[in-house]
Amino acid sequence: MTIKSYREDLMQLVSYLREQRQKAALDVTDWSMRALRGWLVWLHEQGYSRSTISRRLAAARAFGRFLCRQGALQVNPAQSLRGPRQERKLPHFLTQEQIHQLLQAPFPGTWQGLRDRAILEVLYSAGLRVSELVGLDLDDIDLREGFLHVRGKGKRERLALLGPAAQQALTEWLAAREAFLQQRRTCGTPAVFVNRFGTRLSSRSVGRLLHTYLRQTGIDTRTSPHTLRHTFATHLLDAGADIRGVQELLGHKQLTTTQIYTHVSTRRLRDSYRQAHPRA
């Protein structure tokens, strides 16, 4: 929240309270739970979005904390108010054509190109979080069996599967990695993916290289490394995969976290039906 928007939100609240109290000068007794609840109802009736109401409530809470620090209030009534439940946005994902274009974008004639192709293939094939990807060590890979040992959120461990294309890309990268590190005389790092200095690649670097290929292919630049994880899950469910299996592959603790992807698949199915069925 910027200072300007914070000030505007507070001034709107003050204006509302003045009108309700029918007085020009307010005091701390006007900053009550009842008054603030009425203000939230009024915001809703005026048609403000949930995100706008939440932002304005956050400004009111911050101002209430300030009044408490100054000794003007003993308790901040705004702190106990519950804001509107935010709508859960459907995850952004790529089509099969787009993911094919993206995976073909890195030039395999350089060590960076081999690395980048392996990164994109593994993100899509295994559905990894970018933090899980850059955290991979050589001992985490079993190319013969086609799986990765992944350390996910909350230190939960799981096995992630690799498809043939990802296995091939990773095999080619590991050979190039060894030659590159020998050339730099920095063979000590266990990291699977390294930067030009021979040290572990960062999550930010993965984001930057992805955007390079997005611009190159003309794919929506809102795409992030996490979009490939969304794409992985959506494509699996579109192809009829069991949601419990997808939950395990993603490393989700709760099934409800995975179910957001079923909404995406259902929406796509409905759109296809409306476009194709003569009586839809």
Set out the residue ranges of the language-model regions.
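Conserved catalytic core of the tyrosine transesterase superfamily
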Residues: 1-280
